[in-house]
Amino acid sequence: MSETIAAIATGQQPCAIGILRLSGDGVCAALDAVFRAGNGKPAAQQSPRAMVLGDLLDETGQVIDNVLCVRFPAPHSYTGEDCAELHCHGSPIVLDAGLRALLAAGCRQAGAGEFTKRAFLNGQMDLIQAESVVDLIDAETAEQAHNAVCQLDGALSRTVARIYDGLMDMAARFYAVVDYPDEDIEDVQREQMLDTLRTAQNDLETLVAGFSRGRLMKLGVPTVLLGKPNAGKSSLLNALLGYDRAIVTDLPGTTRDTVEEKAVVGGVLLRLIDTAGIRSGGDAVEALGVERSREAAKRASLAVLVLDGSRSLTAEDEEAMALVEAAPHLIVAVNKSDLPRRLDVGALADRFDNVLSVSAATGEGLDALAEAIAAQFPAGETVGGALLTNARQADAANRALSAVAEARSALRIGMTADVVLTDCEAALEALGELNGKRVRDDLVETIFSRFCVGK
């Protein structure tokens, strides 16, 4: 018997539609207590997966709202248990009253992520898919949403399951050799096993290599705006954000510390870092800000060098150029294109690959800048169409990769079956942690605590 849980599945702000969600063995009994169907039938006699119009009632039998009810019998539901939803008008007052009625009818308030946790425990999805649910909810870009949907659809899970099943079959053969010493691995079998391990290693290497991109996609690309004072870095930051975040004045040294904000530019999530202008002199506070600018430049994945196109290059510009030349990705934004040009853009183009003219004041060239940023971070190839996006997944994949590489090496040089088997078991343990086949209870609790109530 599973305890029946209930929760508000939609937000707490007024909206057109609000949803109350139930799961557990007592769903029909709870519905009969709070829902009066227009057709007069009890919940158990309503057609599954069909919307039924009726009244939502409070504990005293008073009508709260005119609602739609839909029931999903087990096992064909999100959680694998009997489930139902009540679709109300999206007033927080209505939803709270409906939830109170369900709790009075014997339901328990669902905990954070408890619906998805039940789906995982009942085998409706693995741990990778469960984590993708919260990734999809939190998605800030189309790429993040696409990756989450791919994971929810099982793209990454299928790859992990294929590797896991191949290693399980191979481990079974080695168990037979260990248990029955007279048995041996034939040459043909050995080559097949080496092929299995080679494929597993290649797939895991691709997954692990994709984590750096997945992490950037999820957290945002660290992007430093660097240049001399009054080049227009803060104005460019504000233009990219679409609102005034940084203070802009004609006085050099206005920005004295790094200012960080997220923005989606060219479909890429950026962590924009506005920095103090690079120059010598200034007071102690400004000098500290300049030092932080240099540190930010070293850590950034993308550097946007901002130059003042209305002035010739200076020693401060050259210093800023030297700081960003080693950046993994670099774009030179020649700002103030709305003013008479004094900077030799042709000479810059000979030195740097991506040189663009922009005007933070008028918005000219910002679309080209967005396109240039998107070109720096194209959607890369992934195993099965999904990227690892969190440290837990990457750690498990790394441990699996290391164990598979050890097993392959041991088998290739003719080590005994028990040695190869030990490495295979280590790989299986790590892969089981990745998809949830062999995961600790405390880790499961930690993962689902990240979810919102009602999901």
Regions found by a protein language model. Give the residues of each.
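A glycine-rich (often HGG/GG-containing) alpha/beta subdomain
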Residues: 1-146, 150, 154, 328-331
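C-terminal-of-GTPase-core extension/linker across diverse P-loop GTPases
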Residues: 2-12, 142-264, 281-283, 312-455
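Switch I (G2) and immediately adjacent beta-strands of P-loop GTPase domains
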Residues: 53-65, 69-73, 253-281, 299-302
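Structural motif
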Residues: 89, 307-310, 336-337
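Conserved beta-strand segments of alpha/beta enzyme cores
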Residues: 108, 269-271, 354
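Short glycine-/small-residue-rich Rossmann-like dinucleotide-binding loops
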Residues: 241, 276-277, 301, 308, ...
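Generic enzyme active-site microenvironment
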Residues: 272, 306, 333
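Inter-motif core of Ras-like GTPase G domains
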Residues: 286-310
